[in-house]
């Protein structure tokens, strides 16, 4: 049985520093769509271990940087990750990290 966003009443995102409840259809849909991609779930697992930049994630997952960058934008738009810029050996790096530790879905 496939789960659709219309069947979800509420999503709770729980983190060390903040917790929020999502109950609007548009926001729930954004999160469900972000989690529907196997590639995006792999990225979440990767940065759960350690925050990383696009090139590290792409290398570890054996995917192109362009693809990873596009997927990170979708995860960031859904509010599941945060990104910050840091100086690196070859310029500025965009470091991605999980924003929350848990996602609870209520029906």
Give the location of each predicted region.
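Short helix-coil-helix linker/hinge
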Residues: 33-40
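Alpha-helical residues within the helix-turn-helix
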Residues: 59, 76-77
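Conserved segment of winged-helix/HTH DNA-binding domains
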Residues: 88-107
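Short capping segments at the starts of secondary-structure elements
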Residues: 49-56
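N-terminal leader segment of winged-helix/HTH proteins
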Residues: 1-32, 87, 94
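Pre-recognition alpha-helix immediately N-terminal to the DNA-recognition helix
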Residues: 41-45
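Glycine-centered, phosphate/nucleic-acid-interacting loop/turn motifs that mediate DNA/RNA or nucleotide
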Residues: 79, 85
